[in-house]
């Protein structure tokens, strides 16, 4: 029914695309490869649904980001390893359906150079339950960059209003596992009666020069 959230990077002398699919029940995420950025070959589903499980992410997940070698605007994105592992960011909803219920964020890792065999956390690393009212409706896309040995995770979230708004916040970590929200969140806010009055979302952060 839908293909969403493409994230393109260079790995093993090929272009890879991390992307999410929706089948009416929930999100699952996959990889495709290409030599020319125009013709893509499906490689495999890496984040699957597991309804027989009692895991927090059993409905499946929307993978949004993989940690890169660097975050330079002027370079092709290449995967980077942290402690010998590749890292993937995803969010998962608690119920079947389209974005059904408040999502939470997890980080998966792999040592597999083919990027097909992933280890998923037993619990989310970042939850709306620990946040403020502006994110009480759940979390969405996140991206992670490193600056001065500190990890920064930018994420968008929504409130619980019927006509909800989505805004972008940031959290920091020293180990990718334990995150602390910035007290000044949200760092990107909606502007009433403007083009961005409801959504300021889907962050993608790069560094340009100094």
Q: Residues of each region from the PLM?
A:
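Carbohydrate-active catalytic/glycan-binding domains of CAZyme proteins
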Residues: 1-210
């Amino acid at each position: 029914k839908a293909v969403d959230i493409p994230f393109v990077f260079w790995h093993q002398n090929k272009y890879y695309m991390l992307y999410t699919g929706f089948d009416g029940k929930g999100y699952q995420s996959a990889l495709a490869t290409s030599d020319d950025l125009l013709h893509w070959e499906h490689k495999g589903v890496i984040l699957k649904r597991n309804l027989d499980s009692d895991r927090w992410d059993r409905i499946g997940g929307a993978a949004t980001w993989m940690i890169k070698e660097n975050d330079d605007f002027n370079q092709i994105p290449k995967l980077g390893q942290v402690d010998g592992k590749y890292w993937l960011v995803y969010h998962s909803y608690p119920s079947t359906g389209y974005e059904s219920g408040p999502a939470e964020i997890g980080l998966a890792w792999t040592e597999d150079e083919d990027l097909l065999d992933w280890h998923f956390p037993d619990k989310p690393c970042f939850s709306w339950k620990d946040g403020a009212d502006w994110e009480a409706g759940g979390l969405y896309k996140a991206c992670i960059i490193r600056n001065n040995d500190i990890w920064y995770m930018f994420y968008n979230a929504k409130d619980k209003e019927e006509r909800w708004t989505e805004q972008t916040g940031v959290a920091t970590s020293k180990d990718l596992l334990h995150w602390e929200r910035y007290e000044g969140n949200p760092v990107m806010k909606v502007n009433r009666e403007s083009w961005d009055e409801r959504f300021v979302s889907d962050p993608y952060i790069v560094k340009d020069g100094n």
